[in-house]
Swiss-Prot record:
Transmembrane regions: none
A GO CC annotation given for this chain: cytoplasm
One GO term (biological process): protein refolding
The organism's taxonomic lineage, starting at the top: Bacteria, Pseudomonadati, Pseudomonadota, Gammaproteobacteria, Pseudomonadales
Subcellular location(s) per record: Cytoplasm
Enzyme class: isomerase
Family: Belongs to the chaperonin (HSP60) family.
Role: Together with its co-chaperonin GroES, plays an essential role in assisting protein folding. The GroEL-GroES system forms a nano-cage that allows encapsulation of the non-native substrate proteins and provides a physical environment optimized to promote and accelerate protein folding.
Keywords: ATP-binding, Chaperone, Cytoplasm, Isomerase, Nucleotide-binding
Subunit structure: Forms a cylinder of 14 subunits composed of two heptameric rings stacked back-to-back. Interacts with the co-chaperonin GroES.
Binding residue positions for ATP: 30-33, 51, 87-91, 415, 479-481, 495
Catalyzed reactions per annotation: ATP + H2O + a folded polypeptide = ADP + phosphate + an unfolded polypeptide
Protein name: Chaperonin GroEL
Length: 547
Protein backbone atom coordinates (compact mmCIF):
# COMPACT_ATOMS: atom_id res chain seq x y z
CA UNK A 1 0.00 0.00 0.00
CA UNK A 2 1.39 3.42 -0.98
CA UNK A 3 2.37 5.90 1.73
CA UNK A 4 -0.13 8.70 2.45
CA UNK A 5 0.32 12.35 3.35
CA UNK A 6 -2.10 13.83 5.89
CA UNK A 7 -2.85 17.53 6.31
CA UNK A 8 -4.92 18.92 9.18
CA UNK A 9 -7.16 21.90 9.90
CA UNK A 10 -6.33 25.19 8.27
CA UNK A 11 -3.53 23.89 6.03
CA UNK A 12 -5.84 21.18 4.58
CA UNK A 13 -8.68 23.65 4.02
CA UNK A 14 -6.39 26.26 2.41
CA UNK A 15 -5.09 23.72 -0.11
CA UNK A 16 -8.64 22.56 -0.94
CA UNK A 17 -9.77 26.19 -1.26
CA UNK A 18 -7.04 26.82 -3.86
CA UNK A 19 -8.39 23.87 -5.91
CA UNK A 20 -11.99 25.08 -5.52
CA UNK A 21 -11.03 28.54 -6.79
CA UNK A 22 -8.98 27.29 -9.76
CA UNK A 23 -11.86 25.15 -11.05
CA UNK A 24 -14.60 27.68 -10.26
CA UNK A 25 -12.69 30.59 -11.88
CA UNK A 26 -12.38 28.59 -15.13
CA UNK A 27 -16.06 27.62 -15.09
CA UNK A 28 -17.57 30.97 -14.08
CA UNK A 29 -15.99 32.76 -17.05
CA UNK A 30 -18.80 31.16 -19.12
CA UNK A 31 -21.75 32.52 -17.07
CA UNK A 32 -24.36 34.83 -18.58
CA UNK A 33 -25.10 36.23 -22.06
CA UNK A 34 -21.64 37.84 -22.26
CA UNK A 35 -19.77 34.89 -20.76
CA UNK A 36 -16.57 33.88 -22.56
CA UNK A 37 -15.55 30.58 -24.12
CA UNK A 38 -13.09 28.11 -22.61
CA UNK A 39 -10.75 26.22 -24.95
CA UNK A 40 -9.84 22.66 -23.93
CA UNK A 41 -6.90 20.72 -25.34
CA UNK A 42 -7.68 17.18 -26.51
CA UNK A 43 -5.19 14.31 -26.67
CA UNK A 44 -5.96 14.01 -30.40
CA UNK A 45 -7.69 16.21 -32.94
CA UNK A 46 -8.65 19.87 -32.65
CA UNK A 47 -9.20 21.46 -29.23
CA UNK A 48 -12.80 21.80 -27.99
CA UNK A 49 -14.30 25.25 -27.49
CA UNK A 50 -17.21 25.37 -25.05
CA UNK A 51 -19.41 27.60 -22.90
CA UNK A 52 -20.86 24.62 -21.03
CA UNK A 53 -19.86 24.71 -17.36
CA UNK A 54 -19.91 20.97 -16.74
CA UNK A 55 -17.77 20.27 -19.84
CA UNK A 56 -15.11 22.65 -18.50
CA UNK A 57 -15.29 21.21 -14.97
CA UNK A 58 -14.90 17.62 -16.18
CA UNK A 59 -11.61 18.44 -17.92
CA UNK A 60 -9.86 19.93 -14.89
CA UNK A 61 -7.41 17.76 -12.96
CA UNK A 62 -4.78 19.47 -10.75
CA UNK A 63 -1.24 18.25 -10.07
CA UNK A 64 -1.30 18.91 -6.29
CA UNK A 65 -3.32 16.09 -4.68
CA UNK A 66 -4.87 18.27 -1.96
CA UNK A 67 -5.81 21.08 -4.33
CA UNK A 68 -7.26 18.46 -6.68
CA UNK A 69 -9.56 17.18 -3.89
CA UNK A 70 -11.14 20.64 -3.62
CA UNK A 71 -11.49 20.87 -7.40
CA UNK A 72 -13.07 17.40 -7.62
CA UNK A 73 -15.65 18.27 -4.94
CA UNK A 74 -16.75 21.33 -6.92
CA UNK A 75 -16.76 19.21 -10.07
CA UNK A 76 -19.24 17.00 -8.20
CA UNK A 77 -21.45 20.08 -7.60
CA UNK A 78 -21.59 20.70 -11.37
CA UNK A 79 -22.28 17.01 -12.10
CA UNK A 80 -25.08 16.82 -9.51
CA UNK A 81 -26.82 19.89 -10.91
CA UNK A 82 -26.39 18.48 -14.42
CA UNK A 83 -27.77 15.04 -13.46
CA UNK A 84 -30.75 16.50 -11.62
CA UNK A 85 -31.84 19.26 -14.01
CA UNK A 86 -29.53 18.98 -17.04
CA UNK A 87 -28.40 22.59 -16.69
CA UNK A 88 -27.39 25.20 -14.09
CA UNK A 89 -23.89 23.77 -13.70
CA UNK A 90 -22.12 27.15 -13.83
CA UNK A 91 -24.58 28.72 -11.36
CA UNK A 92 -24.03 25.78 -8.98
CA UNK A 93 -20.24 26.17 -9.23
CA UNK A 94 -20.37 29.93 -8.55
CA UNK A 95 -22.64 29.37 -5.53
CA UNK A 96 -20.38 26.61 -4.16
CA UNK A 97 -17.26 28.77 -4.54
CA UNK A 98 -18.91 31.64 -2.67
CA UNK A 99 -20.20 29.38 0.15
CA UNK A 100 -16.73 27.84 0.61
CA UNK A 101 -14.88 31.19 0.54
CA UNK A 102 -17.29 32.97 2.91
CA UNK A 103 -17.62 29.91 5.14
CA UNK A 104 -13.86 29.38 5.53
CA UNK A 105 -13.47 33.01 6.63
CA UNK A 106 -16.00 32.26 9.40
CA UNK A 107 -14.16 29.04 10.35
CA UNK A 108 -10.86 30.97 10.53
CA UNK A 109 -12.59 33.49 12.83
CA UNK A 110 -13.34 30.66 15.27
CA UNK A 111 -16.91 29.63 14.33
CA UNK A 112 -17.92 25.98 14.75
CA UNK A 113 -17.97 24.36 11.24
CA UNK A 114 -20.81 21.94 12.13
CA UNK A 115 -23.07 24.80 13.26
CA UNK A 116 -22.13 26.80 10.17
CA UNK A 117 -23.24 23.86 8.01
CA UNK A 118 -26.52 23.55 9.95
CA UNK A 119 -27.17 27.26 9.42
CA UNK A 120 -26.45 26.93 5.67
CA UNK A 121 -28.78 23.90 5.45
CA UNK A 122 -31.61 25.74 7.26
CA UNK A 123 -31.27 28.75 4.96
CA UNK A 124 -31.19 26.50 1.85
CA UNK A 125 -34.48 24.83 2.82
CA UNK A 126 -36.13 28.24 3.37
CA UNK A 127 -34.85 29.65 0.05
CA UNK A 128 -35.95 26.55 -1.92
CA UNK A 129 -39.44 26.96 -0.42
CA UNK A 130 -39.45 30.64 -1.43
CA UNK A 131 -38.29 29.76 -4.98
CA UNK A 132 -41.22 27.36 -5.36
CA UNK A 133 -43.54 30.20 -4.30
CA UNK A 134 -42.04 32.51 -6.96
CA UNK A 135 -42.39 29.85 -9.68
CA UNK A 136 -44.87 30.31 -12.54
CA UNK A 137 -46.00 27.46 -14.83
CA UNK A 138 -44.29 27.33 -18.23
CA UNK A 139 -47.27 26.60 -20.43
CA UNK A 140 -46.97 28.29 -23.81
CA UNK A 141 -44.51 27.95 -26.68
CA UNK A 142 -43.25 31.51 -26.21
CA UNK A 143 -42.09 30.79 -22.64
CA UNK A 144 -40.51 27.48 -23.72
CA UNK A 145 -38.63 29.29 -26.52
CA UNK A 146 -37.40 31.95 -24.07
CA UNK A 147 -36.08 29.34 -21.62
CA UNK A 148 -34.32 27.48 -24.45
CA UNK A 149 -32.81 30.73 -25.77
CA UNK A 150 -31.38 31.74 -22.37
CA UNK A 151 -29.95 28.27 -21.73
CA UNK A 152 -28.33 28.22 -25.19
CA UNK A 153 -26.46 31.45 -24.36
CA UNK A 154 -29.04 33.78 -25.93
CA UNK A 155 -29.26 31.93 -29.28
CA UNK A 156 -32.84 32.56 -30.48
CA UNK A 157 -32.71 29.94 -33.24
CA UNK A 158 -32.12 27.15 -30.68
CA UNK A 159 -34.94 28.30 -28.38
CA UNK A 160 -37.38 28.54 -31.31
CA UNK A 161 -36.56 25.10 -32.74
CA UNK A 162 -36.98 23.41 -29.32
CA UNK A 163 -40.34 25.14 -28.80
CA UNK A 164 -41.45 23.99 -32.27
CA UNK A 165 -40.34 20.42 -31.52
CA UNK A 166 -42.26 20.38 -28.21
CA UNK A 167 -45.34 21.77 -29.95
CA UNK A 168 -45.26 18.95 -32.51
CA UNK A 169 -44.53 15.92 -30.32
CA UNK A 170 -45.97 17.15 -27.02
CA UNK A 171 -44.10 17.88 -23.81
CA UNK A 172 -43.70 14.13 -23.14
CA UNK A 173 -42.44 13.40 -26.66
CA UNK A 174 -38.92 12.25 -27.42
CA UNK A 175 -36.68 14.98 -28.84
CA UNK A 176 -33.25 13.81 -29.95
CA UNK A 177 -30.30 15.96 -31.01
CA UNK A 178 -28.10 14.86 -33.90
CA UNK A 179 -25.31 16.37 -35.97
CA UNK A 180 -26.75 17.72 -39.23
CA UNK A 181 -25.08 18.05 -42.61
CA UNK A 182 -25.99 21.67 -43.43
CA UNK A 183 -25.25 25.09 -41.95
CA UNK A 184 -28.74 25.63 -40.49
CA UNK A 185 -30.55 23.79 -37.69
CA UNK A 186 -33.30 21.49 -39.00
CA UNK A 187 -36.28 19.80 -37.36
CA UNK A 188 -37.82 16.55 -38.57
CA UNK A 189 -40.79 14.92 -36.87
CA UNK A 190 -41.85 11.27 -36.99
CA UNK A 191 -45.56 10.94 -36.25
CA UNK A 192 -46.95 7.77 -34.72
CA UNK A 193 -44.86 4.95 -33.31
CA UNK A 194 -41.51 4.28 -34.93
CA UNK A 195 -39.16 1.44 -34.01
CA UNK A 196 -35.73 0.56 -35.38
CA UNK A 197 -36.50 -2.59 -37.34
CA UNK A 198 -37.00 -2.66 -41.12
CA UNK A 199 -38.66 -5.08 -43.57
CA UNK A 200 -37.35 -8.67 -43.50
CA UNK A 201 -37.22 -8.94 -47.29
CA UNK A 202 -36.79 -6.27 -50.00
CA UNK A 203 -39.51 -8.14 -51.95
CA UNK A 204 -42.08 -6.51 -49.62
CA UNK A 205 -41.26 -3.08 -51.15
CA UNK A 206 -44.23 -1.64 -53.07
CA UNK A 207 -42.92 1.92 -53.53
CA UNK A 208 -39.69 1.42 -55.51
CA UNK A 209 -39.11 5.17 -55.94
CA UNK A 210 -38.70 5.65 -52.16
CA UNK A 211 -37.67 2.03 -51.41
CA UNK A 212 -40.38 1.54 -48.77
CA UNK A 213 -43.24 -0.86 -48.17
CA UNK A 214 -46.43 1.08 -47.47
CA UNK A 215 -49.59 -0.60 -46.17
CA UNK A 216 -52.86 1.38 -46.06
CA UNK A 217 -55.36 0.38 -43.37
CA UNK A 218 -53.49 -2.83 -42.44
CA UNK A 219 -54.31 -5.50 -39.90
CA UNK A 220 -51.38 -6.11 -37.52
CA UNK A 221 -50.38 -9.54 -36.25
CA UNK A 222 -48.13 -9.48 -33.15
CA UNK A 223 -46.32 -12.71 -32.24
CA UNK A 224 -43.70 -13.18 -29.50
CA UNK A 225 -41.92 -16.18 -31.09
CA UNK A 226 -40.13 -17.14 -34.30
CA UNK A 227 -42.32 -18.15 -37.23
CA UNK A 228 -40.75 -20.72 -39.53
CA UNK A 229 -43.67 -23.07 -40.29
CA UNK A 230 -46.22 -21.57 -42.71
CA UNK A 231 -48.88 -24.13 -41.74
CA UNK A 232 -49.32 -22.39 -38.36
CA UNK A 233 -50.18 -19.17 -40.20
CA UNK A 234 -52.57 -20.49 -42.84
CA UNK A 235 -55.83 -19.87 -40.87
CA UNK A 236 -55.00 -16.22 -40.18
CA UNK A 237 -53.67 -15.61 -43.74
CA UNK A 238 -56.89 -17.01 -45.24
CA UNK A 239 -59.02 -14.82 -42.95
CA UNK A 240 -57.00 -11.71 -43.89
CA UNK A 241 -57.24 -12.56 -47.63
CA UNK A 242 -61.05 -12.85 -47.31
CA UNK A 243 -61.16 -9.49 -45.52
CA UNK A 244 -59.23 -7.99 -48.46
CA UNK A 245 -56.88 -5.96 -46.24
CA UNK A 246 -53.07 -5.75 -46.04
CA UNK A 247 -51.26 -7.50 -43.17
CA UNK A 248 -48.23 -6.46 -41.11
CA UNK A 249 -46.54 -9.26 -39.16
CA UNK A 250 -44.39 -8.26 -36.17
CA UNK A 251 -42.64 -11.32 -34.72
CA UNK A 252 -39.39 -12.33 -33.02
CA UNK A 253 -38.35 -13.51 -36.50
CA UNK A 254 -39.92 -14.86 -39.69
CA UNK A 255 -37.62 -17.26 -41.53
CA UNK A 256 -37.30 -20.10 -44.01
CA UNK A 257 -40.45 -21.50 -45.56
CA UNK A 258 -42.73 -19.01 -43.79
CA UNK A 259 -40.88 -15.96 -45.14
CA UNK A 260 -40.65 -17.45 -48.66
CA UNK A 261 -44.42 -18.14 -48.72
CA UNK A 262 -45.24 -14.60 -47.55
CA UNK A 263 -42.99 -13.12 -50.27
CA UNK A 264 -44.64 -15.27 -52.98
CA UNK A 265 -48.15 -14.35 -51.77
CA UNK A 266 -47.22 -10.68 -51.75
CA UNK A 267 -45.69 -10.74 -55.26
CA UNK A 268 -48.69 -12.58 -56.72
CA UNK A 269 -51.08 -10.14 -55.03
CA UNK A 270 -52.94 -12.86 -53.09
CA UNK A 271 -52.31 -11.11 -49.74
CA UNK A 272 -50.60 -7.75 -49.47
CA UNK A 273 -48.22 -8.48 -46.62
CA UNK A 274 -44.99 -7.30 -44.95
CA UNK A 275 -43.04 -8.80 -42.06
CA UNK A 276 -40.70 -7.17 -39.55
CA UNK A 277 -38.75 -8.29 -36.49
CA UNK A 278 -40.08 -7.13 -33.11
CA UNK A 279 -38.02 -4.30 -31.56
CA UNK A 280 -35.82 -4.81 -28.50
CA UNK A 281 -34.53 -7.95 -26.81
CA UNK A 282 -35.72 -10.24 -24.03
CA UNK A 283 -38.19 -8.71 -21.58
CA UNK A 284 -37.97 -5.33 -23.32
CA UNK A 285 -39.15 -6.97 -26.57
CA UNK A 286 -42.24 -8.38 -24.81
CA UNK A 287 -42.98 -4.97 -23.28
CA UNK A 288 -42.64 -3.21 -26.66
CA UNK A 289 -44.87 -5.75 -28.39
CA UNK A 290 -47.45 -5.05 -25.67
CA UNK A 291 -47.05 -1.29 -26.34
CA UNK A 292 -47.80 -1.87 -30.04
CA UNK A 293 -50.79 -4.04 -29.08
CA UNK A 294 -52.22 -1.28 -26.86
CA UNK A 295 -51.59 1.36 -29.55
CA UNK A 296 -53.27 -0.66 -32.32
CA UNK A 297 -56.00 -2.37 -30.30
CA UNK A 298 -54.60 -5.85 -30.92
CA UNK A 299 -53.42 -8.78 -28.80
CA UNK A 300 -49.93 -10.26 -28.60
CA UNK A 301 -50.14 -13.92 -29.67
CA UNK A 302 -48.19 -15.66 -26.92
CA UNK A 303 -48.23 -19.20 -25.61
CA UNK A 304 -47.78 -17.72 -22.12
CA UNK A 305 -51.41 -16.55 -22.22
CA UNK A 306 -52.69 -19.62 -24.05
CA UNK A 307 -52.88 -18.19 -27.58
CA UNK A 308 -51.36 -19.91 -30.61
CA UNK A 309 -51.07 -18.88 -34.26
CA UNK A 310 -53.44 -21.68 -35.35
CA UNK A 311 -56.24 -20.31 -33.15
CA UNK A 312 -55.69 -16.64 -34.09
CA UNK A 313 -58.74 -14.80 -35.48
CA UNK A 314 -59.23 -11.32 -36.93
CA UNK A 315 -60.35 -10.12 -33.45
CA UNK A 316 -56.80 -10.66 -32.18
CA UNK A 317 -55.29 -8.39 -34.84
CA UNK A 318 -54.55 -4.72 -34.38
CA UNK A 319 -55.49 -1.94 -36.81
CA UNK A 320 -53.77 1.22 -38.03
CA UNK A 321 -54.42 3.90 -40.63
CA UNK A 322 -51.05 3.35 -42.30
CA UNK A 323 -47.75 1.52 -41.82
CA UNK A 324 -44.48 2.47 -43.55
CA UNK A 325 -41.51 0.08 -43.56
CA UNK A 326 -38.06 1.19 -44.72
CA UNK A 327 -34.81 -0.76 -44.64
CA UNK A 328 -34.08 0.42 -41.06
CA UNK A 329 -37.36 1.59 -39.51
CA UNK A 330 -41.04 0.77 -39.22
CA UNK A 331 -43.61 3.49 -38.49
CA UNK A 332 -47.18 2.76 -37.37
CA UNK A 333 -49.40 5.80 -37.95
CA UNK A 334 -52.74 6.37 -36.23
CA UNK A 335 -53.21 3.06 -34.38
CA UNK A 336 -56.79 2.10 -33.52
CA UNK A 337 -56.17 1.51 -29.79
CA UNK A 338 -58.64 2.63 -27.12
CA UNK A 339 -57.55 5.99 -25.64
CA UNK A 340 -58.23 4.86 -22.06
CA UNK A 341 -56.02 1.77 -22.53
CA UNK A 342 -53.21 3.89 -24.01
CA UNK A 343 -53.39 6.32 -21.07
CA UNK A 344 -53.34 3.42 -18.58
CA UNK A 345 -50.24 2.04 -20.30
CA UNK A 346 -48.59 5.50 -20.26
CA UNK A 347 -49.29 5.81 -16.51
CA UNK A 348 -47.80 2.36 -15.91
CA UNK A 349 -44.59 3.24 -17.81
CA UNK A 350 -44.34 6.60 -15.97
CA UNK A 351 -44.40 4.69 -12.70
CA UNK A 352 -41.59 2.43 -13.95
CA UNK A 353 -39.57 5.55 -14.89
CA UNK A 354 -40.00 6.86 -11.35
CA UNK A 355 -39.02 3.51 -9.79
CA UNK A 356 -35.94 2.64 -11.87
CA UNK A 357 -32.43 3.50 -10.67
CA UNK A 358 -30.71 2.73 -14.00
CA UNK A 359 -30.10 5.66 -16.38
CA UNK A 360 -30.16 3.30 -19.38
CA UNK A 361 -33.51 1.77 -18.35
CA UNK A 362 -34.93 5.24 -17.69
CA UNK A 363 -33.91 6.42 -21.17
CA UNK A 364 -35.47 3.35 -22.83
CA UNK A 365 -38.69 3.72 -20.79
CA UNK A 366 -38.94 7.41 -21.73
CA UNK A 367 -38.54 6.46 -25.40
CA UNK A 368 -41.42 3.98 -25.06
CA UNK A 369 -43.46 6.65 -23.29
CA UNK A 370 -42.91 9.12 -26.11
CA UNK A 371 -43.79 6.58 -28.79
CA UNK A 372 -47.13 5.97 -27.09
CA UNK A 373 -47.93 9.58 -26.27
CA UNK A 374 -46.88 11.63 -29.26
CA UNK A 375 -44.02 10.91 -31.55
CA UNK A 376 -40.35 11.60 -32.03
CA UNK A 377 -38.70 14.86 -33.10
CA UNK A 378 -35.10 15.04 -34.31
CA UNK A 379 -33.19 18.34 -34.15
CA UNK A 380 -30.31 18.29 -36.64
CA UNK A 381 -27.69 20.83 -35.61
CA UNK A 382 -26.07 22.78 -38.44
CA UNK A 383 -22.62 24.39 -38.25
CA UNK A 384 -19.71 25.56 -40.40
CA UNK A 385 -17.01 23.36 -38.86
CA UNK A 386 -16.67 20.26 -36.70
CA UNK A 387 -15.41 22.27 -33.69
CA UNK A 388 -18.41 24.62 -33.93
CA UNK A 389 -20.72 21.61 -34.40
CA UNK A 390 -19.63 20.01 -31.11
CA UNK A 391 -19.96 23.28 -29.20
CA UNK A 392 -23.39 24.04 -30.69
CA UNK A 393 -24.69 20.50 -30.13
CA UNK A 394 -23.73 20.70 -26.43
CA UNK A 395 -25.65 24.00 -26.15
CA UNK A 396 -28.75 22.52 -27.85
CA UNK A 397 -28.69 19.55 -25.45
CA UNK A 398 -28.38 21.93 -22.47
CA UNK A 399 -31.26 24.05 -23.74
CA UNK A 400 -33.40 20.94 -24.22
CA UNK A 401 -32.77 19.83 -20.62
CA UNK A 402 -33.60 23.33 -19.38
CA UNK A 403 -36.92 23.48 -21.26
CA UNK A 404 -37.91 20.04 -19.95
CA UNK A 405 -37.10 21.24 -16.41
CA UNK A 406 -39.18 24.40 -17.02
CA UNK A 407 -42.19 22.37 -18.17
CA UNK A 408 -41.81 20.12 -15.11
CA UNK A 409 -41.49 22.69 -12.27
CA UNK A 410 -42.21 26.07 -13.88
CA UNK A 411 -40.04 29.17 -14.36
CA UNK A 412 -38.69 32.04 -12.27
CA UNK A 413 -37.15 35.39 -13.33
CA UNK A 414 -33.68 34.70 -14.76
CA UNK A 415 -30.33 36.45 -14.56
CA UNK A 416 -29.79 35.62 -10.87
CA UNK A 417 -32.86 37.69 -9.86
CA UNK A 418 -34.94 34.77 -8.51
CA UNK A 419 -32.27 33.95 -5.92
CA UNK A 420 -32.12 37.62 -4.80
CA UNK A 421 -35.93 37.70 -4.44
CA UNK A 422 -35.89 34.38 -2.55
CA UNK A 423 -33.70 36.02 0.13
CA UNK A 424 -36.89 37.35 1.74
CA UNK A 425 -37.47 33.74 2.83
CA UNK A 426 -34.55 34.03 5.28
CA UNK A 427 -35.04 37.64 6.44
CA UNK A 428 -36.46 36.52 9.80
CA UNK A 429 -34.72 33.13 9.94
CA UNK A 430 -32.78 32.52 13.14
CA UNK A 431 -30.47 29.63 13.99
CA UNK A 432 -30.26 27.79 17.31
CA UNK A 433 -27.08 29.69 18.20
CA UNK A 434 -24.80 32.50 16.99
CA UNK A 435 -22.70 30.21 14.78
CA UNK A 436 -25.80 28.98 12.91
CA UNK A 437 -26.78 32.64 12.38
CA UNK A 438 -23.38 33.15 10.74
CA UNK A 439 -24.10 30.10 8.50
CA UNK A 440 -27.36 31.75 7.41
CA UNK A 441 -25.43 34.99 6.70
CA UNK A 442 -22.86 33.01 4.65
CA UNK A 443 -25.62 31.74 2.35
CA UNK A 444 -27.22 35.20 2.22
CA UNK A 445 -23.96 36.59 0.77
CA UNK A 446 -23.40 33.57 -1.51
CA UNK A 447 -26.87 33.98 -3.07
CA UNK A 448 -25.69 37.24 -4.69
CA UNK A 449 -22.72 35.53 -6.40
CA UNK A 450 -24.45 34.40 -9.66
CA UNK A 451 -25.81 37.92 -10.34
CA UNK A 452 -22.42 39.47 -9.47
CA UNK A 453 -20.65 37.09 -11.88
CA UNK A 454 -23.14 37.70 -14.74
CA UNK A 455 -22.59 41.46 -14.32
CA UNK A 456 -18.79 41.11 -14.05
CA UNK A 457 -18.69 39.02 -17.25
CA UNK A 458 -20.66 41.73 -19.06
CA UNK A 459 -18.12 44.39 -18.00
CA UNK A 460 -20.30 46.36 -15.54
CA UNK A 461 -19.88 47.06 -11.81
CA UNK A 462 -21.43 44.17 -9.78
CA UNK A 463 -22.00 46.06 -6.48
CA UNK A 464 -23.98 48.87 -8.16
CA UNK A 465 -26.21 46.43 -10.08
CA UNK A 466 -26.82 44.11 -7.10
CA UNK A 467 -27.80 47.10 -4.93
CA UNK A 468 -30.25 48.42 -7.55
CA UNK A 469 -31.82 44.96 -8.11
CA UNK A 470 -32.24 44.54 -4.33
CA UNK A 471 -34.08 47.88 -4.15
CA UNK A 472 -36.52 46.69 -6.82
CA UNK A 473 -39.30 44.13 -6.36
CA UNK A 474 -40.96 41.24 -8.16
CA UNK A 475 -39.48 40.51 -11.59
CA UNK A 476 -37.34 43.68 -11.69
CA UNK A 477 -33.78 42.81 -12.67
CA UNK A 478 -30.80 43.51 -14.90
CA UNK A 479 -30.52 42.35 -18.51
CA UNK A 480 -26.77 41.83 -18.98
CA UNK A 481 -27.18 41.36 -22.75
CA UNK A 482 -28.44 44.94 -23.22
CA UNK A 483 -27.23 46.54 -19.92
CA UNK A 484 -30.84 47.55 -19.14
CA UNK A 485 -33.04 47.23 -16.06
CA UNK A 486 -36.64 46.04 -16.31
CA UNK A 487 -39.13 43.20 -15.90
CA UNK A 488 -37.15 40.00 -16.52
CA UNK A 489 -40.23 37.97 -17.55
CA UNK A 490 -41.28 40.62 -20.11
CA UNK A 491 -37.71 40.74 -21.46
CA UNK A 492 -37.89 36.96 -21.91
CA UNK A 493 -35.15 36.19 -19.35
CA UNK A 494 -36.43 33.08 -17.58
CA UNK A 495 -34.77 30.27 -15.65
CA UNK A 496 -36.40 26.91 -14.93
CA UNK A 497 -37.22 26.67 -11.21
CA UNK A 498 -35.79 23.15 -11.13
CA UNK A 499 -32.42 24.33 -12.50
CA UNK A 500 -32.09 27.14 -9.92
CA UNK A 501 -33.25 24.85 -7.09
CA UNK A 502 -30.89 22.01 -8.06
CA UNK A 503 -27.93 24.41 -8.38
CA UNK A 504 -28.51 25.82 -4.89
CA UNK A 505 -29.06 22.42 -3.24
CA UNK A 506 -25.96 20.88 -4.86
CA UNK A 507 -23.79 23.89 -3.96
CA UNK A 508 -24.86 24.12 -0.31
CA UNK A 509 -24.48 20.35 0.14
CA UNK A 510 -20.87 20.16 -1.11
CA UNK A 511 -19.96 23.61 0.26
CA UNK A 512 -21.03 22.53 3.74
CA UNK A 513 -18.98 19.33 3.48
CA UNK A 514 -15.80 21.24 2.57
CA UNK A 515 -16.30 23.59 5.56
CA UNK A 516 -16.56 20.65 7.97
CA UNK A 517 -13.36 18.99 6.70
CA UNK A 518 -10.70 18.76 9.44
CA UNK A 519 -8.21 16.37 7.83
CA UNK A 520 -7.27 15.50 4.24
CA UNK A 521 -5.46 12.32 3.21
CA UNK A 522 -3.69 11.94 -0.15
CA UNK A 523 -1.29 9.45 -1.65
CA UNK A 524 2.38 10.44 -1.81
CA UNK A 525 3.51 10.24 -5.42
CA UNK A 526 7.00 8.82 -5.57
CA UNK A 527 9.27 9.85 -8.41
CA UNK A 528 10.20 6.62 -10.11
CA UNK A 529 13.71 6.53 -11.63
CA UNK A 530 13.77 6.45 -15.42
CA UNK A 531 14.06 2.99 -16.93
CA UNK A 532 17.66 2.05 -17.80
CA UNK A 533 18.70 2.28 -21.46
CA UNK A 534 20.24 -0.49 -23.57
CA UNK A 535 23.92 -1.18 -22.79
CA UNK A 536 26.52 0.24 -25.17
CA UNK A 537 27.05 -2.22 -28.03
CA UNK A 538 30.62 -1.03 -28.73
CA UNK A 539 32.15 -0.79 -32.19
CA UNK A 540 31.75 -3.56 -34.72
CA UNK A 541 35.34 -4.44 -35.54
CA UNK A 542 36.49 -5.47 -38.98
CA UNK A 543 33.81 -3.47 -40.84
CA UNK A 544 36.18 -0.85 -42.18
CA UNK A 545 36.90 -2.58 -45.51
CA UNK A 546 33.22 -2.78 -46.48
CA UNK A 547 33.12 0.65 -48.12
Amino acid sequence: MAAKEVKFGDSARKKMLTGVNVLADAVKATLGPKGRNVIIEKSFGAPTITKDGVSVAKEIELKDRFENMGAQLVKDVASRANDDAGDGTTTATVLAQSIVNEGLKAVAAGMNPMDLKRGIDKATIAIVKELKGLSKPCADSKAIAQVGTISANSDNSIGDIIAEAMEKVGKEGVITVEEGSGLENELSVVEGMQFDRGYLSPYFINKPDTMVAELDGPLILLVDKKISNIREMLPVLEAVAKAGRPLLIVAEDVEGEALATLVVNNMRGIVKVAAVKAPGFGDRRKAMLQDIAVLTGGTVISEEIGLSLESTTLEHLGNAKRVILSKENTTIIDGAGVEADIQARVTQIRQQVADTSSDYDREKLQERLAKLSGGVAVIKVGAGSEVEMKEKKARVEDALHATRAAVEEGVVPGGGVALIRALQGINDLKGDNADQDVGIAVLRRAIEAPLRQIVANSGDEPSVVVDKVKQGAGNFGYNAATSEYGDMIEMGILDPTKVTRSALQAASSIGGLILTTEAAVAEIVEDKPAAGGMPDMGGMGGMGGMM
